[in-house]
């Protein structure tokens, strides 16, 4: 009975650690479930009963972001809109537009092609000097359509360099060894559009900017930070701007300016641009060769092209999303309907938030007369379910690492060598996961993950640190345990028994 009480503090520590880990991993799940649920609700019925304004108001209410704005846009501007939170006040809030910047770059390149300064078949090396090996034979078309063979490596993009041109960054790029021949397969990579920005800078001899009449701004624009998810709550996102990355993700502006850009794409000028873009587009399906232009899903000059069935007919659709930590944008265009849906939100992080693009798709389908998609309770894509699962798993892992450390400090392992081996193996596995596993799965380093999903990054670092410290504690304890002969324990027990008997005899 006495020994049971001696080891009770260890079990109490274990229980406390597991309880904290369980609470940490599950406290945020109700909020996360709300975030990853498709917010369709009764939007379809509201829109049909009360019109576009009522439907937009319901959508904005259901999305429940710190700042959100959604609009239906025609060639002449906004037809209907609803704004809430940070995006409803004055003066207007400006945010970075993320990858919607690619369409602006595409229109800039298309204008240079129309003027004869560029050709789709031109090789990168003909316009940009100081290229590292492997880049010079990539064509302008391959860059525009993501068929260059370049991989999506955010270690080379999304850097805070507000005063640096793309031309200055190009010589610092790593040597490129394509896994497949240039032009043979689609692989989305923002690096393509950084290189296109360098092409425009070289051809024009001027700093990179949007085409005339397009209201987008570079790093001189002051933007709001926005928010990223943090254990079911929100925390401010870090502020940064990549002037070498305006072409792929760092143009910005207000919601009004974003709707103006959507209207530009419905104008006569925009329709000419999209005719060029669609004609040069490449299939995005992994199993489709780049030469197969019969596929519906295509990528052109910074835009996705496909079709959607709604109202008993098939509609052409042009769309793209944009995201930086703390901000999300999306434009969805139905050119045959002469309307577009535009959405901006001042909160975004990865993984998760898939309800934002899905809601825009849902709304555009309704406007075209389509039937609402049944609400399955989960958002489109892998981000939404992965986020709470990863958060819960890492919380339990962190608690387990804490338990291991407590046992090393306070416990009395009978097999110290085994405890040391287990701790060392766990430590090595956690370090490998932190250094190699996270980048392999997410494409982000731990530091970069901290911008998109700080709660995941915090738990990953904490669990690894606790495991490593536990291994060191096991090593220290193992080094302090003196070697004993096999019968040492029995001898010690007999000595204590005799000493106890002698003591009893002297007291009587």
Predicted regions and their residues:
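Second-shell loop/turn segments in exported
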Residues: 38-47, 91-96, 127-131, 156-160, ...
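Secretory targeting and sorting signals
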Residues: 1-36
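Catalytic loop of the DD-peptidase/beta-lactamase superfamily, centered on the K-T-G motif
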Residues: 2, 34-73, 242-498, 504-508
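Short, solvent-exposed loop/helix junctions and linker helices
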Residues: 46-50, 94-99, 137, 185-190, ...
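Short, conserved catalytic-motif segment at the N-terminal edge
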Residues: 44-98, 114, 118, 122
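Active-site helix/loop module of the DD-peptidase/beta-lactamase fold
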Residues: 50, 91, 96-100, 112-155, ...
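Catalytic-site signature segments of enzymes, centered on catalytic residues
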Residues: 154-259
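Active/ligand-binding-proximal structured segments within catalytic/core domains
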Residues: 104-105
């Amino acid at each position: 009975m006495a020994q049971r009480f001696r080891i009770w503090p260890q079990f109490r520590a274990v229980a406390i650690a597991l309880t904290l880990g369980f609470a940490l991993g599950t406290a945020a799940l109700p909020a996360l479930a709300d975030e990853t649920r498709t917010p369709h609700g009764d939007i379809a019925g509201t829109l049909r009963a009360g019109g576009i304004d009522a439907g937009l108001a319901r959508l904005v209410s259901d999305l429940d972001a710190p700042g959100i704005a959604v609009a239906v846009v025609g060639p002449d501007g906004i037809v209907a809109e609803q704004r809430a939170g940070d995006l409803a006040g004055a003066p207007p809030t400006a945010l970075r537009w993320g990858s919607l910047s690619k369409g602006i770059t595409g229109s800039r390149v298309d204008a240079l092609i129309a003027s004869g300064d560029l050709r789709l078949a031109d090789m990168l090396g003909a316009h940009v000097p100081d290229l590292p090996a492997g880049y010079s034979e990539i064509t302008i078309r391959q860059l525009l359509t993501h068929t260059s063979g370049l991989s999506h490596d955010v270690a080379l993009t999304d850097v805070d360099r507000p005063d640096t041109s793309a031309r200055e960054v190009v010589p610092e790029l790593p040597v490129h060894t394509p896994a497949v021949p240039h032009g043979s397969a689609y692989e989305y990579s923002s690096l393509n559009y950084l290189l296109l920005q360098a092409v425009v800078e070289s051809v024009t001899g001027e700093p990179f900017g949007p085409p005339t009449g397009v209201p987008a701004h570079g790093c001189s624009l002051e933007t709001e930070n926005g928010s990223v998810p943090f254990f079911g709550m929100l925390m401010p996102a870090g502020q940064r701007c990549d002037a070498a990355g305006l072409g792929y993700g760092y143009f910005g502006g207000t919601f009004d300016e974003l709707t103006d850009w959507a209207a530009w794409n419905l104008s006569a000028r925009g329709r000419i641009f999209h005719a060029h873009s669609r004609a040069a587009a490449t299939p995005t399906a992994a199993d489709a060769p780049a030469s197969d232009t019969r596929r519906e899903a295509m990528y052109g000059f910074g835009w996705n092209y496909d079709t959607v069935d709604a109202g008993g007919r098939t509609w052409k659709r042009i769309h793209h999303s944009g995201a930086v930590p703390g901000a999300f944008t999306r434009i969805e265009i139905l050119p045959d309907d002469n309307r577009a849906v535009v959405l901006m939100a001042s909160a975004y992080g990865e993984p998760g938030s898939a309800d934002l693009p899905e809601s825009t798709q849902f709304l555009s389908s309704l406007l075209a007369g389509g039937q609402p998609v049944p609400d399955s309770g989960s958002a489109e894509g892998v981000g939404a379910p992965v986020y709470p699962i990863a958060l819960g798993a890492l919380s339990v892992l962190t608690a387990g690492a804490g338990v291991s450390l407590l046992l090393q400090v306070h416990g009395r392992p009978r097999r110290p060598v085994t405890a040391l081996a287990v701790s060392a193996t766990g430590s090595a596995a956690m370090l490998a996961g932190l250094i190699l596993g996270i980048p392999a799965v997410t494409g982000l380093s731990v530091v970069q993950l901290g911008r998109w999903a700080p709660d995941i990054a915090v738990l990953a670092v904490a669990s690894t640190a606790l495991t490593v410290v536990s291994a060191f504690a096991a090593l220290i304890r193992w080094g302090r345990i003196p070697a004993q002969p096999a019968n040492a324990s029995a001898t010690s027990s007999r000595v204590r028994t005799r000493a106890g008997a002698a003591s009893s005899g002297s007291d009587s």
